[in-house]
Amino acid sequence: MRIFAPAVNDFFISLLLMGALSGGPTLPLPYWAQTGQYGRMPSTAGSMMWVQARTQFDDARTFQWRWGVGLTSNSVVSRFADECYLSGRWKALTLDAGLKHREMDFLGASPSLGSLSVTGGHLIESGNTRAMPGYRLSLAPVDIPFTHGHLALYGFWGDFKTLDRRWVDEALVHRGEIFLMARIGEHLELHAGLDHYALWGGTAMDANWYNYWRVVTGSRASESGSRSDQINVIGDHGGSECFKLKWTEDEWIATFQHDIPYSDRSGMRFNNFPDGVNTLNFGWTRKDRWISDILYEFHYTRNQSGPLHEAETDADGNVIPWHKGMHIAGGDDYFNNGEYRSGWTYYGRTIGLPLFYPAGTRARTWEPNTLVRGVENNRIRAHHLGLSGQFFRRMPYKLMLTYSQNYGTFGSPYAGESAWGKPWGSVKETPLWQFSAALLGEVPSLFGQNWLHLTYGLYGDYGQVLPSQMGVSLGVRCCWGKW
């Protein structure tokens, strides 16, 4: 038996040249032209080049490895490493080291067109930003002993470093996920688990093993830490609780997924009900249909454990003893933090749910790769529809339609009176509505050449938050090997 072999398996190389136009030279590209693109697209009208090469795991080997490199250049950023990683796999364990994007769920007729979901199936890591350098140790589903294959565990553990300009420079990121999967009969799977992140270190605290242990265990800071970290937990913690049902048949797969965001213990105790992202997806296993995949999502994040959060310390900084009438669970303020003020963003873009617009979006002062103070809009109500298939059973496409009502944050509402500090329901809040649409597609095998493909995109924004405009993108992809 060959334990290790450096043979190349399914080598793939691709070059994409693309141009994009918006409603004006100073306007940002429409929402879906730059959202969910791993930060590759320019923020305004311009051009983009993306070249990549990678290999795949060889399942015939006991120990398998793969590598990948990618370089992106656009009219806003001259060039940057999109991916650069080396991965090894042994049985159920996979170690990825370097710059590597997380793979998305709910893909349609062509993986190259991306996910049909706003979040890519991951509320916390949606594929909206560039990759961070670090490592991720993943565990594929492993059966729990004595359950006769009915129960399995899977997840990952990882640590990364931020490289962008931030309020706390050189902040570190700890990531972790753990899921329990139950197999019921031949067709039904139930999944339940946590997807967690923590920002720590950087110029805000020492990055040592002592603090790392307190971060991963969710402990409070020592006396040398900030007052906030001594009261709550060390660093900025957030994540999502996920519940998923998946029914698989030979010809189709149906999935329902419910993701609940949290940014403190109150969210983990479901005090923020009914906040969450609800996803319903139906897909045929054969993708050469006019419509092969249908996805609907309902987003609601207005509650955030309520608008009341009383002071936890007195004027002298002493902790006030908790009592039953004390409201300290409200104002979760997803993806924002008072100390790590860049929040859950990277290179100016929201890492998680991209309907949480980064600060400066509505005022049109936002620019990628600049210092951003978190998100300005994390209280939303939204409906999203994604469709995919193949025109004439050979040309993959993806249709995205998103309507949202946006309330800003509790502390800084977009419009009307703020509900912060007032009993729930006593204030009639005023949202700003927004509609964004996109049709993306590919025309494969131009001029009869299997390696040459045309890519296109038509985009539109209309509403009260983003500039009302149309946009278009057109590109040529040259690729060899299996995507």
State the predicted function of each range.
Residues 49-57, 84-88, 135-141, 178-184, ...:
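Residues on the lipid-exposed face of transmembrane beta-strands in outer-membrane beta-barrel proteins
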Residues 15, 19-27, 65-73, 88, ...:
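Transmembrane beta-barrel strands of outer-membrane/channel proteins
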Residues 140-323, 403-430, 439:
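Signature for the C-terminal beta-barrel architecture of outer-membrane proteins
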Residues 309-414:
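C-terminal structural cap/anchor segments
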Residues 43-51, 78-82, 128-138, 170-176, ...:
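Residues that define the transmembrane beta-barrel architecture of outer-membrane proteins
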Residues 69-164, 182-200:
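Outer membrane beta-barrel
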Residues 12, 17, 134, 467-483:
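Outer-membrane beta-barrel "beta-signal"
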Residues 4, 8-13, 54-67, 89-92, ...:
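Short loop/turn motifs that connect adjacent beta-strands in outer-membrane beta-barrel proteins
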